[in-house]
Amino acid sequence: MPSELAMNNDELHVVMFPFLAFGHISPFVQLSNKLFSHGVHVTFLSAASNIPRIRSTLNLNPAINVISLKFPNGITNTAELPPHLAGNLIHALDLTQDQVKSLLLELKPHYVFFDFAQHWLPKLASEVGIKSVHFSVYSAISDAYITVPSRFADVEGRNITFEDLKKPPPGYPQNSNISLKAFEAMDFMFLFTRFGEKNLTGYERVLQSLGECSFIVFKTCKEIEGPYLDYIETQFRKPVLLSGPLVPEPSTDVLEEKWSKWLDGFPAKSVILCSFGSETFLSDYQIKELASGLELTGLPFILVLNFPSNLCQS
């Protein structure tokens, strides 16, 4: 029960509440492991279907508590959805506010670390006397380019276009040569599309999250992204703290015998491994084109394909 997890007032306690895609969950897990190694008590919130995988990556440490949230529509991670329905998951996340508030009141943590989608969490945390921390799973250079208030400085009330995104926002570090090609800018336009009952864009959610939290944390260091971190700090007028790079521990799993034998049949570094992560789903056309391109190399290859769990596979 959550009441059994409440800690003594003198023990630093944080709650982790990432978005429900594993690309977001993983950095929160790595930060949890790092904080726990320094004596911080950690409680992790997620959907029930995600918990086995989360537990397996929390250094197998039972002292890190993982609590499941109930989702009204039964959809609990992006692997269960095709990309165009990801907004449904964000809406489902919005419906957990009462659960989250009850848990925070019972657990009484000092801080709650949250993700871009939970724009409502800073206000909720403030109501119960808890500081909120926006933990960005992205690089500072990308957040500084896309999700800062000055991004709309030159738009003057009209809708933003991909042409606007091809150039950096006003005040962006001058020594940077970063810009987006047209196809890259088009990919980011989804951030400015309204969806859900709240009719908010992804950009508005991120901006509210960053603007209302107590402080911001990035998984980087000054030596790598210093000018962009300074720019973000200036834009949001609040402290930006750094965790340093967060990477998982090297795997100790033994390779399956069938793959070990297959790989042993080729010279070292001669096999191509092609994988786009656990939550990228290619169309039939993309799969055929990709496989054809790999075959044209004349090299042996392993192509890893993923499909949403609720779709028929052919």
From Swiss-Prot:
Q: Which GO terms describe its molecular function?
A: UDP-glucosyltransferase activity
Tissue-level expression reads: Expressed in young leaves, flowers, pods and pod shells. Barely detected in seeds, roots and root nodules.
Q: Which organism is it from?
A: Glycine max
Which residues are the signal sequence here? none
Lineage, top ranks:
Eukaryota, Viridiplantae, Streptophyta, Embryophyta, Tracheophyta
Remaining remarks: Flavonol glycosides (FGs) having rhamnose at the 6''-position of glucose or galactose that is bound to the 3-position of kaempferol are present in cv. Koganejiro, whereas FGs of cv. Kitakomachi are devoid of rhamnose. In contrast to cv. Koganejiro, FG2 of cv. Kitakomachi has a two-base deletion that generates a truncated polypeptide devoid of enzymatic activity.
Gene that encodes the chain? FG2
Q: What is this protein called?
A: Inactive UDP-glycosyltransferase 79A6
Q: Which InterPro entries match?
A: UDP-glycosyltransf_plant (IPR050481)
Query: What does the record give as the function of this protein?
Result: Has no flavonol 3-O-glucoside (1->6) rhamnosyltransferase activity in vitro.
